[in-house]
Amino acid sequence: MASSQSSSSSIRPQAGLNEGDHQSLPQLDTLISYLLGAKRSLSSITHVWRANEIVTASHSALEKSVVLCSRTGFLRRGLNGQLRLLYDVRSEVEQISYRGRDEFSIALKNLDAADARLKHTLDLLRGTIVHASFRPGDEEQKSLHDFVDERGVEELHASLKASIDRTNTARAELDTSNHEFDDELQAIKKSLRHYHTATKLASSRLSITSSSSSASDSGLLTLSSMPGQIQSLEAHAQEMATLLEALVRHFDLCVTAVKHTDGGGAVARSITGDMPAGVDGSNDGMPNIGAEINANLNAPLDPMTDAEYQEMVAVLIKDAPEADDVVMEIQDRINEMESIFEQVQAQRDALLSISKATIEVHSHLSSLASSRLPRYISQAHNFTRVWLEENDRINSGLVELSDLHSLYDGFLNAYDSLMLEVARRRHVRQRVEKVLRDTRHKLDQLHDEDAAARETFRAEQGDFLPSDIWPGVGLAPMQVQFTRLSGGQLDGGPIGQKPLEEPSGGEYAGAAKAGVSDGSAEGEQIPDLPRHLVEEAYARVKARNKVASQLHTV
């Protein structure tokens, strides 16, 4: 719109114009309609005030968004490292749990196997009855188990049970700790899902993009469109202010034209007495338009020539149709600003949501790292310490179980070998007795032959020989007596003796012909075992030797 012209200080009379000029100039009613339209157009000042508020609020939103981006980016970079460390710790704790559980399971299987072997051997000892010939006749029947003291086994079982219980307790505490750790991780994952949801929402609906691929990978957001949007808002606001100034100039020109028209002064004062709301307001961004309008209304009219008046009216005629277009443009611009401002606010709110989600994760991690994480790590270390201690005890107990099994299994094998030894000794005794019987028979023959020869000599020559020529000439043949000597102890202990025969001269013949008795009461007592027991013992010893040979070969 063209700028207004200065007016004369008094109403210019109509006689100053000729009839042609009077017909070409608009009537007062037309000028009043222009003034009313200009007055209505000043209502657009509320849009200008709103534009100024939007620009101010957008600057505040930008400042807050920059702070949020910076803080969120800083926290997010720290979170990435903390999360990696946290999952590394959880993985290590889980490895400790799995490793300990596997080792403990293997140890229990080995213990169960060793204990089963020991119990089987003890059952065999209970089921193996000592043959009565090994024991005194008045003694109650006994099994091999009666010769075993199981207190050592019971004490070993109690020790192993204590180690297993302590390990189970430590493992249960570790499992509980790990479950709590997992709950913490689930809570953190939930917080991270909130973060990712907020990020996706911002990325899909707003102009928030990642500054680079690495930034995208780390989830750090940066503002790309907000500064441009605010520049657009500022441009709209500036243009709206310019348009409003044009409307004000148009209004002032209408007031001046009406006042310079005959009879228009009172009408102008009447119309301008009730200005649209907001015209009298002011702030740092906008001047007090109401004061300027009032100053123009109350200012005295400057003298104006006919040419100046005609020029002013021509400007009004030209500008009046454009006033509505200016108002529409201001309306369009404020609508555009509201739309942009909604995007700015939404972007700020999205960043605020991301920031809150990040702070939530950070707070959770900080609380976890400062209070609960050390306890989870300590619990894993405690389990490792307990398991190392008890594993040594369990391994020692496993060795003791194996030793006891070997001892009792050796006892079983030794008893079988004892029966074989008894059979061997009895066979040797039988061979000895046979030698004795054969020798006795030969000695008896020699004795009889010698006695007969002596008797023949005595009968033939005895009458001729004096009795004192040889005292032994009339003696009977000597007798040979076998004496059984106890073998004593194999380690060289004292040896007892028990003669089998002490015959007198008159008993010799009978004793000599009686042979040698193999009674068990004489010399060494050898149990008389049934043949089937010896054969069964031999089969078992042979089977054990075969297994031992195979193991040695492997």
From Swiss-Prot:
GO terms for molecular function: molecular adaptor activity; protein kinase activator activity. Pfam families: ATG17_like. InterPro entries: Atg17, ATG17-like_dom. Belongs to the ATG17 family. This is Autophagy-related protein 17. Residues 1-10 have a biased composition (Low complexity). Autophagy-specific protein that functions in response to autophagy-inducing signals as a scaffold to recruit other ATG proteins to organize pre-autophagosomal structure (PAS) formation. Modulates the timing and magnitude of the autophagy response, such as the size of the sequestering vesicles. Plays particularly a role in pexophagy and nucleophagy. It comes from Penicillium rubens (strain ATCC 28089 / DSM 1075 / NRRL 1951 / Wisconsin 54-1255). Keywords: Autophagy, Coiled coil, Cytoplasm, Membrane. GO terms for biological process: autophagosome assembly; autophagy of mitochondrion; piecemeal microautophagy of the nucleus. One of its GO terms (cellular component) is Atg1/ULK1 kinase complex. It is a peripheral membrane protein. Residues 327-353 form a coiled coil. Residues 1-22, 490-529 are annotated as: Disordered.
